[in-house]
Amino acid sequence: LQTLFQNCVKLGINFFNEYYALDLITVKDDDGNTQVAGVVAYELATGDLHVFHSKAVIFATGGFGKIYKTTSNAHTLTGDGVGIVWRKGLPLEDIEFFQFHPTGLAGLGILLTEGARGEGAILRNASGERFMERYAPTIKDLAPRDIVARCMVKEVLEGRGAGPHKDYVYLDCTHLGAEVLETKLPDITEFARTYLGVDPVTEPVPVMPTAHYAMGGIPTNTAGEVLQNNDTVVPGPYAAADCARVSVHGSNRLGTNSLLDINVFGKRSGRNAVEYVQTADFVPLPEDPAKEVREMLEGLRNNQGTERIAVLRKTLQEEMDANAQVFRTEETLTNVMGTIHDLRQRYKNVHVDDKGKRFNTDLLEAVELGFLLDLAEIVAYAARNRKESRGGHMREDYPDRDDAQYMQHTMAYLTGDPHSPDPEDHIKLDWKPVVFTKNEAGELNYPPMERKY
């Protein structure tokens, strides 16, 4: 990141610091196709709205892990970019697939690298048992993230959790020695000591799975171009990295592969956007392109409601942790969708304390809460619709993978008022075929197989 920033400075690139994109400016052509004309951004320092008229827009806005209480994601990762695209009627793809990293600091979600297990750290339950030997006898603690996360939660649910509330397991690094921990895994020692008061050199660290990475997002092709349906390109918008769904990770990303994703598709998106604007024309701006955002902000700022932003956000995150996390069922997903509907009604009555314009973070948090509610509902609705278990999506009531019916991508579209009580009234789910590579004989190069460890 530092290298990237230094090169931007060297090239004289202008940064609009503390500007938050809140809307994608779109217009329809004569055939009803979506065209992009730029973005509307909110300047936090002044409270002013700015219209950026552009031929192309690149979304690199990160994920939406803050729909969950326990997450490794930063506080700003509320899915604003993904939500902006969704509200414009463009689809989101495979939104139900979310990766939960096994080793987050218990109760906090701060990530402890799986490099620790790569160095030989061991997961243990309350009795000190190396429980992964029971679940994945060949690779034990080095099993894929989704499997390890489920095993950890299962240990807790079956009463083998550690701590006064029996709600976590241990990451045991004590046998690695101080030199390995201090030189190869310095973040683990620093985080455990700072946030839990635990010294990994001498005692095991309490850990539990943490919401880490959204496999789904804004659908793109390998050029980074945003797709309007299965394969139709929307001229102008591009997306890359955590907010995008180019589908190189399938339903279950492998560790560190997101870094490769960022480098490859970030570069492709940038290069292709530059190439596109060389020949493209500006799409004329609609009259008063900032009107919708202005009305939304003023409505929130002037609302005389009594609901607190923090209370609504906390309720949403806790309910998503309880009902749509590592394990999911028809009942839990239906429950959380009911909660989200109730929260939407309460959101209409939300109170913003700060009525000013300069650095009004209270107002911005209210906007972010709206995006969180949108995305949490889509995740739960798509997860309920996929009645199987695959990768980062585990249904306890449908524990097996069902390739015959569900070897396909979910495409979610906004089709009505998101405040309507039934998601079916405003969310349309469709399917997109999975692309298989085949050899000259017409056989699959990589036929689907059951994972066994």
Per-region residue spans from a language model:
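Feature captures the FAD/FMN-dependent oxidoreductase FAD-binding
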Residues: 1-43, 49-53
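Short beta-strand to alpha-helix junction loop
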Residues: 1-6, 16, 71-79, 104-108, ...
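Flexible, glycine/charged-enriched surface loops at secondary-structure junctions
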Residues: 12, 18, 92-96, 164-167, ...
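Glycine- and aromatic-enriched mobile tails/lids
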Residues: 27, 124-133, 137-142, 147, ...
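Core beta-strand elements of the Rossmann-like FAD/NAD(P) dinucleotide-binding domain
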Residues: 46-56, 233-236
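Glycine-rich loop(s) and the adjacent beta-strand/alpha-helix scaffold that form part
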Residues: 56-110, 255-272
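An anion/pyrophosphate-binding glycine-rich loop and adjacent beta-alpha core
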Residues: 84, 90-206, 272-278, 318
